[in-house]
A protein has these predicted regions:
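Phosphate/pyrophosphate-binding loops at sites that engage ATP/ADP/AMP, CoA/4′-phosphopantetheine
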Residues: 161-180
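Local cysteine-cluster metal-coordination motifs and their immediate loop/turn environment
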Residues: 33-65
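Fe-S ferredoxin-like electron-transfer domains
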Residues: 53-100, 107
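Helical "lid/coupling" subdomains associated with nucleotide-phosphate turnover
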Residues: 139-148, 152-156, 160-166, 191-195, ...
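Phosphate-binding loop and its immediate beta->loop->alpha context
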Residues: 72-89, 124-159
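Short acidic-glycine loop/turn motifs at beta-strand connectors
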Residues: 8-10, 52, 64-65, 113-116, ...
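Gly/Thr-rich phosphate-binding beta-strand-loop-beta motif of the actin/hexokinase/Hsp70
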Residues: 91-130, 255-273
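Short glycine-rich phosphate-binding loop at a beta-alpha junction
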Residues: 176-187, 333
Length: 386
């Protein structure tokens, strides 16, 4: 067993690492959260840290005794918490209820008064499971490949949501004894993991979950019962059911399309006579996995790019650019096509093949492929484009 010093935000922490254990695993075990969209397989490049002042991928490093690890200070994303007003049907019920939106990437908790339905507090955060993979497939793989992995992921998310509800209660001057119910919605995999139910069946044909949560699971959080939103199928979860209910689309004649655009993308097409549903594993596309300088749409992300005698760009938060979010990536690719830096086959040209005015932005990588430099820190590679 070795000892490693971790530096974060001006503070230092000493953690222990097992023999042969990766730095990412040791950091997870010690309560530190690093983005690892690929689940620690060395593919996404998002778990980069400083090890003795050298930039390394935490999932590829087995630390030595005495190593000093510097973690990046990542800002949180802008998580939507505004929703349409919902008319209360609470009647004469008393006490409080918590509504939980358990997303693959983000978690939101909202506290209500049952009598009258008044909203008291909303808290949102990144899903702490993100360190174990950016999408539901990565999380399923973790539960299948890691001894006790399912219980570990369940414990992590239950502790996070319990803490978020507790903070909401404290902020409102309320006690835990006033909490009467918690209602939780999420995709089928997230609801299974929260309930510590096996998810292997969802990963293989015929993609059959353990339950669709049609009946209560006798689950409890903070001494209050947990009610799960019924799911539709293995990859169409309780979040779709709740969305169709709250939007009222199930009552409307004709055809409406309900979209849940997230890490696990789902859609439902239909109306008062029923819905057809489907899903797609969007994966961590919105978080920039697989793109060398990709990142989520948080402070420091280049969100828009255009060419007007030079490359101009907008940065979320107004600070120095750190990477490209999805909209910035699409803008940049379009601008490079217009400027002749990307050919009709999708190839990013090396400098000698590009228009003369573009050559100062281009270099070659170690394999001879073109690399475009928007700034010193932000680039786009040929592999990113293809």
């Amino acid at each position: 067993m070795s000892s490693v010093r971790v530096l974060l935000g001006g503070k230092s922490f000493d953690i222990k690492t097992e023999d042969g254990e990766t730095l990412l695993s040791a950091l997870r075990r010690s309560g530190f959260t690093l983005p690892a969209a690929c689940g620690g397989r060395g593919k996404c490049g998002k778990c980069r840290v400083g090890v003795n002042s050298v930039s390394r991928l935490a999932c590829r490093v087995v630390p030595n005794d005495g190593d000093v690890v510097t973690l990046p200070e990542k800002s949180g994303g802008r998580i939507l918490t505004q929703t349409p007003e919902i008319v209360s049907c609470a009647g004469k019920m008393s006490g409080l209820a918590a509504a939980v939106d358990l997303g693959t990437t983000t978690v939101a908790v909202r506290l209500y008064e049952l009598a009258g339905g008044r909203e008291l507090k909303t808290i949102s955060a990144w899903n702490a499971q993100a360190a174990y993979g950016g999408d539901v497939i990565s999380r399923i793989q973790y539960t299948m490949e890691t001894p006790n992995g399912l219980n570990e992921l369940s414990r992590i998310i239950r502790a996070q949501i319990e803490d978020m509800i507790s903070r909401a209660l404290e902020d409102c001057g309320k006690s835990k004894s006033e909490l009467r119910h918690t209602v939780l919605v999420g995709n089928t995999v997230m609801q299974h993991i929260f309930a510590s139910l096996p998810v292997e069946g969802i990963a293989r044909a015929p993609f059959k979950p353990e339950t669709l949560f049609e009946i209560d699971c006798n689950d409890v959080l903070l001494d209050a019962p947990v009610h799960y939103s019924p799911c539709v199928a293995g990859y169409v979860g309780g979040d779709i059911t709740a969305g169709l209910l709250s939007s009222g689309l199930y009552k409307k004649p004709g055809r409406s399309l309900f979209l849940d655009i997230g890490t696990n993308g789902e859609m439902a097409l239909g109306g008062s006579d029923g819905f057809a549903c489907c899903a797609v594993a969007s994966g961590p596309a919105f978080e920039g996995a697989g793109i060398s300088c990709g990142m989520a749409a948080v402070d420091g992300a280049v969100s828009h790019v255009r060419y007007d005698g030079g490359f101009l760009y907008d940065v979320i938060g107004g600070d120095a650019p750190c990477g490209l979010c999805g909209s910035g990536l699409i803008d940049l690719a379009a601008a490079l096509i217009d400027c002749g830096c990307i050919d009709e086959g999708g190839r990013l040209l090396p400098p000698e093949e590009a228009p003369e005015k573009m050559r100062r932005y281009l270099t070659r990588d170690e394999n001879g492929n073109g690399v475009f430099h928007l700034t010193r820190e932000v680039c786009l590679t040929a592999q990113d484009v293809r």
